[in-house]
């Protein structure tokens, strides 16, 4: 899933009065609100069956008569004191136009157009308009309907090339333009032969700028020899008032299918295309489905509708607000300036009862809040912060908001919660589209108009309707408000409908409950980076947009790169505080990093660098659509070249920095080189890399750690194992200390190269001689050491915080504590206290009984020492080493660096040299039997029938290859440990018990105790998260049916008990045990899936294995990072083909099974069969740990 995927649920409605109570209170004390209550009788007359759209509009406008319909800011003509020019100065009040006056103005315009002597316009022709929403614009738009014209509202941010293309496609007879956009209109009209009239609206008589704009337009047209007639709308209305009203459009054969409106989409993915609105669809804006589709769920029809409209009529949202208010008898107030600079002033004057916001407006409100906090030095949540919210609500937003909604684009839960906290009302989440109409309200389908829906798999992004726990995919719907398609674009229309007639929204959603959806992302907003990671650009922008320093941000990426860039517009406050240079860039970088940490984003989701843009993205500069959405093609067109150059510069800088680090390393402190190398390889600034930071905290993983290790080795000529770099106990300062220690000691410790030869591709048992690892004195004394103690009272355990190690610690404590004995464990940590805390944490899985049991035993018989078994003397203080050499009776070496990707050379230090250090302690002062935990991977490369369970490993596997096979390095390193212990047995008679485990499964009793990183847990999690499994994990029989197969795994509780019991008996000799499950019981992966399905987990089977694997991988890549990290994706190559169907274990387990039976280990006194209870517990434990 995307986000287990934990989809945010809607916040509870803010506490307080119900909507009905708030409406009643406001109406009782506010005459304007009382006068704006809808009239049911008007609505019934206007929406009766059989009325054409023009008749419906006329019924509303005449029905509400003298009520105020529209309001615009009043202004006065003043003289500019500097230029002396006549300018318009806004006054702190609005002037209104009544419904009756609006109808008369619209009729006058229609009459003048129809009866013009030189260029009459008739029904069926097109009228294009461009401008900011206003009284004039509304009048002209309604006039078009009365005359039977097809309206083509154009986006004010469109380029002239786009405008000309649309005009060419629609061939308008009339072009209406506001003064602000008159120049573009003239350019378009000159290129469009069909245009006969150019109407200028929002013309302010007496304002020099407006007069000059109209004169310039007439001059340009005249000079070009154009016959286009230019009139102001006021002139048209004045002439039209003297003319008879035009007859409303009569019924036609097309009826309400007549084309009434074309809404051209923003073109966020390319050339705009005109969505066709027949009359019946436009009618839904006027008291129809659109009107109440996004109202609050408990709204009553008597909510007074007073709104401020800032949305353009070229966008559906602008029409919803305007026409919805006009069909409710309310008043629409228009924002005074298109750049929204008067936003708060207009709202405080208008005092709306209903709000409709888009995320861009909510972000603006949030930034105002943040700026006020910064100005007074207050913190969020403080009394001063609440006072700012109160001022926002009561003064700047008018103080009488009853309902509020948001739409046009998804909004983050955090921003939603903030707006609700300001307004103290529920913010309705409305989702719809230009083509389909309203789709959901507060995530629940709006029915009607939606009649059917389905989710369509998006395999390339990993979204499937079979996903668990929620189906995901592209939302496809059938709806009563669906449009017939795109104007003159039959091919494009066909692309957005499937073969069953469902409209393809292009939006990926998750169905979290029946007919309840959560938006995931636009299908085209997801980018795959070069390393295979998917990033959702719009989600990242929403997250980073909450920064108090970010005004706007556009995240940029390329599938040829492994990281992201961005274009960032800082807030005015940020620019005022930091300037527009490196200071603001540094502050922004810190802010983005902080948000990334808070949001749990991955390193590749954080822009590595960005361009600072001081000019905001606007409609005017073409970066924003009329609805305020960032147009990615426009961003790419404007900044793409600079961003690609930045990519090249970063790559060159990294290469140069690495060269610089190499050249001057000998003259710098080691820690400086370590920091700079980490910064260069991980794309960070060296100044920002703290020496106390852990490599993984900087975004590093095991593979980047390998690159880092090799680079440091190249510089310092000492081994810097990956185990040192990725150790939870180590930071960069620790890495530097390791290097300094290795350099000062002369690095005489054994290495892969000194033992096997540099660049060796095969390794031999004969290479691994004790004299290469242990000092001559220890080896000389070993053969004559006292024999092991007759009674085991003190056990030394390594790897106790590992998966098996924790239960070995528990098992030994259970045995020794009642006898007064103790268990000593070595754990990495900066000191003993930190080491103890690391061990304690592995028992905190959510099972209080386990934790209490461990703590009780630990208090009585556990000693924790900070150390590292791969270091000299196990990383212990000399006094502790000497004491343990005297006290310890038996050593259990469970510790290892378990990594199935790293090569043998990188695992040589922790796993081979570490085992030699254990052998050294076992051969000091007196012999101490060793229990050694090995792996089934040791058997790789040897025929199963030839792999002798209790044979001499030096003969059974004398020569091994080094290759890139799965777990080759790990298997070789554990094999080498076995060889060394066999050498110690042969040299000094050291008793050894080797246990080679295959899959060690979850604990059958304790909650949450499973090995999250192992392949089996990853597979179960992945099956549950994706909801798909193959028909069979094994090769099918000749008829295509499933075959009996067996899964070789043993629960950890039994494994620990068996190893402890058999290890305790190992006071002499050398014996090996293959800890496998040998039963021929037909219990395999297919049965595990059966059991999960029977337990109610939704998993669908895919018949074709290759198809399943492809879908499975795609789904896994689409999981949220927290799940993807723990999925089987890194190990998916193990499932590349169906496995052979083997019912039983291919390896010999006779020695282990007979020893278990003889010692009566476990309740069954035998190796247990796997059962349904354990597999179902896996699912429960995975959920318990928060991974689903």
Curated annotation (Swiss-Prot):
Keyword line: ATP-binding, NADP, Nucleotide-binding, Oxidoreductase, Phosphopantetheine, Phosphoprotein
Record-linked InterPro entries: ACP-like_sf (IPR036736), AMP-binding_CS (IPR020845), AMP-dep_synth/lig_dom (IPR000873), ANL_N_sf (IPR042099), CAR (IPR046407), Far_NAD-bd (IPR013120), NAD(P)-bd_dom_sf (IPR036291), PKS_PP-bd (IPR020806)
Gene Ontology CC: membrane
GO process annotations (BP): biosynthetic process
Free-text comment on this protein's domains from its UniProt entry: The N-terminal domain likely catalyzes substrate activation by formation of an initial acyl-AMP intermediate, the central region contains the phosphopantetheine attachment site, and the C-terminal domain catalyzes the reduction by NADPH of the intermediate thioester formed from the attack of the phosphopantetheine thiol at the carbonyl carbon of acyl-AMP. Large-scale domain motions occur between the adenylation and thiolation states. Phosphopantetheine binding alters the orientation of a key Asp, resulting in a productive orientation of the bound nicotinamide.
Protein name: Carboxylic acid reductase
Mutagenesis / variant outcome for changing residue 1131 to Y: Loss of activity
Gene: car
Cited function: Catalyzes the ATP- and NADPH-dependent reduction of carboxylic acids to the corresponding aldehydes. Catalyzes the reduction of a very wide range of carboxylic acids, including benzoic acids, heterocyclic, phenylacetic, phenylpropanoic and fatty acid substrates.
UniProt catalytic activity: a carboxylate + ATP + NADPH + H(+) = an aldehyde + AMP + diphosphate + NADP(+)
Domain Carrier residues, every copy: 665-743
Similarity field: Belongs to the ATP-dependent AMP-binding enzyme family. Carboxylic acid reductase subfamily.
Residues that coordinate or bind NADP(+): 801-804, 828, 838, 868-869, 894-896, 934, 970, 974, 997
Residues annotated with O-(pantetheine 4'-phosphoryl)serine modification: 702
Cofactor binding, per record: Binds 1 phosphopantetheine covalently.
EC number: 1.2.1.-
Molecular-function GO terms, alphabetical: ATP binding; long-chain fatty acid-CoA ligase activity; NADP binding; oxidoreductase activity, acting on the aldehyde or oxo group of donors, NAD or NADP as acceptor; phosphopantetheine binding
Effect of residue 998 to G: Does not affect benzoic acid reduction rates but leads to alcohol production. Displays modest benzaldehyde reductase activity
SUPFAM superfamilies: Acetyl-CoA synthetase-like (SSF56801), ACP-like (SSF47336), NAD(P)-binding Rossmann-fold domains (SSF51735)
Cofactors named for this entry: pantetheine 4'-phosphate
Organism: Segniliparus rugosus (strain ATCC BAA-974 / DSM 45345 / CCUG 50838 / CIP 108380 / JCM 13579 / CDC 945)
NADP listed as a keyword: yes
Entry binding sites for AMP: 315, 408, 429-430, 434, 507, 519-522, 528, 629
């Amino acid at each position: 899933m995307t986000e287990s995927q934990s989809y945010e649920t809607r916040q509870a409605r803010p506490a307080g009065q119900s909507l009905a109570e708030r409406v009643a209170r406001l109406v009782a004390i506010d005459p304007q609100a009382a006068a704006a209550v809808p009239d049911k009788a008007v609505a019934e007359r206007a929406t009766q069956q059989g009325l054409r759209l023009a008749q419906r509009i006329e019924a509303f406008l005449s029905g509400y008569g003298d009520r105020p319909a529209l309001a615009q800011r009043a202004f006065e003509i003043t003289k500019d004191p500097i230029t002396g020019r006549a300018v318009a100065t806004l006054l702190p009040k609005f002037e209104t136009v009544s419904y009756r006056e609006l109808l008369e103005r619209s009729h006058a315009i229609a009459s003048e157009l129809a009866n013009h002597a030189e260029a009459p316009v008739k029904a069926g022709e097109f009228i294009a308009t461009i401008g900011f929403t206003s009284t004039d614009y509304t009048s002209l738009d309604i006039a078009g309907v009365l005359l039977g014209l097809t309206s083509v509202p154009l986006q004010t941010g469109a380029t002239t090339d786009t405008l000309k293309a649309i005009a060419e496609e629609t061939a308008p007879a009339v072009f209406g333009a506001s003064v602000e956009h008159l120049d573009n209109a003239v350019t378009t009209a000159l290129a469009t032969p069909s245009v006969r009239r150019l109407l200028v609206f929002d013309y302010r008589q007496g304002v020099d700028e407006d007069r000059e704009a109209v004169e310039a337009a007439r001059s340009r047209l005249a000079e070009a020899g154009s016959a286009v007639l230019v009139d102001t709308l006021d002139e048209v209305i004045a002439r039209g008032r003297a003319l008879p009203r035009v007859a409303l459009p009569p019924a036609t054969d097309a009826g309400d299918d007549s084309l009434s409106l074309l809404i051209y989409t923003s073109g966020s993915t390319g050339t705009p295309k005109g969505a066709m609105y027949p009359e019946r669809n436009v009618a839904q804006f006027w008291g129809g489905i659109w009107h109440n589709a996004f109202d609050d769920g408990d709204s009553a029809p008597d909510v007074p509708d007073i709104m401020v409209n800032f949305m353009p009529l070229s966008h559906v949202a602008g029409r919803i607000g305007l026409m919805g208010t006009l069909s409710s008898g309310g008043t629409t107030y228009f924002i005074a300036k298109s750049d929204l600079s008067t936003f708060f002033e207009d709202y405080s004057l208008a005092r709306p009862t209903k709000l409709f916001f888009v995320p861009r407006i909510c972000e603006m409100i949030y930034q105002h809040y943040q700026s006020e906090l910064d100005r007074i030095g207050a913190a969020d949540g403080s009394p001063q912060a609440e006072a700012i919210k109160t001022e926002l609500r009561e003064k700047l937003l008018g103080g009488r908001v009853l309902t509020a909604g948001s739409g046009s684009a998804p909004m983050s839960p955090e921003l939603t919660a903030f707006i609700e906290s300001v307004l103290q009302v529920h913010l309705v989440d409305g989702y719809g589209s230009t083509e389909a109409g309203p789709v959901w309200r507060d995530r629940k389908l709006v029915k009607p108009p939606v009649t059917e829906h389905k989710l369509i798999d998006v395999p390339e992004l990993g979204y499937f309707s079979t996903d668990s726990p929620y189906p995901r995919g592209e939302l496809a719907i059938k709806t009563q408000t669906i449009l017939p398609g795109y104007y003159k674009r039959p091919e494009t229309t066909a692309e957005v409908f499937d073969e069953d007639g469902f409209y393809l929204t292009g939006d990926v959603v998750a169905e979290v409950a029946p007919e309840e959806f959560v938006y995931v992302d636009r299908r085209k907003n997801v980018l795959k980076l070069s390393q295979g990671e998917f990033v959702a650009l719009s989600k990242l922008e929403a997250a980073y947009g909450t920064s108090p320093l970010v005004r706007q941000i556009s995240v940029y990426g390329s599938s040829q790169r492994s990281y992201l860039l961005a274009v960032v517009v800082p807030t005015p406050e940020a620019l005022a505080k930091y300037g527009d240079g490196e200071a603001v860039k540094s502050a922004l970088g810190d802010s983005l990093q902080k948000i990334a940490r808070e949001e749990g984003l991955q390193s590749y989701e954080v822009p590595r660098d960005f361009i600072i843009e001081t000019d905001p993205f606007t409609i005017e500069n073409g970066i924003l659509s009329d609805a305020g959405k960032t147009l990615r093609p426009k961003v790419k067109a404007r900044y793409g070249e600079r961003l690609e150059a930045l990519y090249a510069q970063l790559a060159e800088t990294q290469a140069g920095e690495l060269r610089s680090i190499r050249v001057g390393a000998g003259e710098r402190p080691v820690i400086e080189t370590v920091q700079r190398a980490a910064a260069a390889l991980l794309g960070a600034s060296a100044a920002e890399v703290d020496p106390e930071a852990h490599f993984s905290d900087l975004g590093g993983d095991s593979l980047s750690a390998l690159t880092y290790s090799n680079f440091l080795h190249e510089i310092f000529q000492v081994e810097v194992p990956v185990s040192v770099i990725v150790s939870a106990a180590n930071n960069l300062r620790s890495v530097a200390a390791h290097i300094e220690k290795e350099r000062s000691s002369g690095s005489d410790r054994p290495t892969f190269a000194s033992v096997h030869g540099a660049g060796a591709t095969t390794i031999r048992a004969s290479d691994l001689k004790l004299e290469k690892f242990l000092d001559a004195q220890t080896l000389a004394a070993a053969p004559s050491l006292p024999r092991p103690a007759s009674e085991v009272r003190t056990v030394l355990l390594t790897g106790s915080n590992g998966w098996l190690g924790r239960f070995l610690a528990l098992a030994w404590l259970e045995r020794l504590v009642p006898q007064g004995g103790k268990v000593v464990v070595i754990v990495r940590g900066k000191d003993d206290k930190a080491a103890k805390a690391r061990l304690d944490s592995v028992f905190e899985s959510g099972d209080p009984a386990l934790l209490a049991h461990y703590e009780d035993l630990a208090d009585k018989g556990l000693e924790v020492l900070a150390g590292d078994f791969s270091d000299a003397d196990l990383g212990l203080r000399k006094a502790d080493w000497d004491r343990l050499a005297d006290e310890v009776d038996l050593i259990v070496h469970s510790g290892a660096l378990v990594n199935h990707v790293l090569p043998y050379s990188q695992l040589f230090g922790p796993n081979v040299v570490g085992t030699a250090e254990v052998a050294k302690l076992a051969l000091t002062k007196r012999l101490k039997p060793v229990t050694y935990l090995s792996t089934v991977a040791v058997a790789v490369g040897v025929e199963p029938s030839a792999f002798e369970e209790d044979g001499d490993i030096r003969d059974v596997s004398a020569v091994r290859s080094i290759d890139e096979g799965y777990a080759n390095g790990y298997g070789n390193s554990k094999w080498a440990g076995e060889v060394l212990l066999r050498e110690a047995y042969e040299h000094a008679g050291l008793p050894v018990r080797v246990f080679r485990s295959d899959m060690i499964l979850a604990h059958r009793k304790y909650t949450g105790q499973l090995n999250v990183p192992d392949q089996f847990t990853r597979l179960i999690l992945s099956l549950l998260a994706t909801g798909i499994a193959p028909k069979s994990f094994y090769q099918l029989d000749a008829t295509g049916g499933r075959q009996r197969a067996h899964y070789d795994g043993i629960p950890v509780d039994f494994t620990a008990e068996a190893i402890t019991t058999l290890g305790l008996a190992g006071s002499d000799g050398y014996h090996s045990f293959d800890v496998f499950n040998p039963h021929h019981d037909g219990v395999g992966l297919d049965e595990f899936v059966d059991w999960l399905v029977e337990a109610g987990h939704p998993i669908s089977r895919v018949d074709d294995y290759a198809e399943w694997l492809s879908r499975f991988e795609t789904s896994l890549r689409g999981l949220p990072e927290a799940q993807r990290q723990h999925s089987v994706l890194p190990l998916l190559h193990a499932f590349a083909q169906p496995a052979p169907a083997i019912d039983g274990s291919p390896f010999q387990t006779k020695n282990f099974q007979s020893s278990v039976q003889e010692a009566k280990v476990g309740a069954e006194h035998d190796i247990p069969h796997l059962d349904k209870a354990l597999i179902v517990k896996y699912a429960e434990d995975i959920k318990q740990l928060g991974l689903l």
